[in-house]
């Protein structure tokens, strides 16, 4: 029922946008890539090429958000993925290259865009969330883990990260390897 309502809303908003109206639409999606895939799923295969063309012309932004518990236990903090419609983004959307969108967002921070992983790293560096929260919410756990480990305030004088644990043999390893 909810999916049908979202489909109807998406089709209606697409028609409104073609006439120059500002349309805001909410979707249950985990990020930009998933939102675009979900929008595509609302349309029959024979309309997908036109959909990508319409989106490349009319779509201005996709904002995705997650609420995570704050490190200090005082409520939640928001992390936001933001995709803006640049010429290159329009080209990728027009071509239906949804798989390239996240990488393009990642490389477009100078335009104000950011991925969830970039937002998680920023929230961690600001002390808003713990490393574990950042890793649990990450799209690419490895990328976020690396950014956390390279963050100098996390490293002690011995060079170890807060994510390192001592093994029974007396070695220090990343907790991630032990969890596998």
Where are these regions (language model features)?
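Short beta->alpha connector loops at strand-helix junctions that form conserved
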Residues: 27-28
């Amino acid at each position: 029922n909810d999916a049908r309502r979202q489909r109807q809303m998406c089709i209606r908003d697409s028609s409104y946008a073609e006439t120059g109206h500002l349309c805001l639409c909410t979707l249950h999606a985990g990020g930009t890539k998933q939102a675009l895939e979900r929008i595509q799923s609302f349309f029959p295969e024979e309309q997908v090429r036109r959909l990508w063309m319409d989106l490349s012309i009319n779509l201005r932004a996709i904002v995705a958000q997650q609420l995570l518990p704050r490190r200090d236990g005082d409520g939640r903090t928001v992390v936001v993925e933001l995709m803006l419609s640049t010429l290159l983004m329009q080209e990728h959307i027009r071509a239906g290259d949804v798989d390239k969108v996240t990488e393009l967002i990642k490389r477009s921070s100078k335009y104000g865009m950011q991925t969830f992983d970039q937002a998680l790293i920023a929230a961690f560096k600001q002390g808003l969330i713990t490393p574990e929260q950042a890793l649990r919410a990450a799209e690419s756990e490895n990328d976020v883990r690396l950014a956390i480990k390279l963050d100098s305030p996390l490293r002690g004088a011995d060079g170890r990260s807060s994510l390192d644990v001592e093994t029974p043999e007396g070695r220090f390893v990343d907790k991630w390897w032990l969890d596998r």
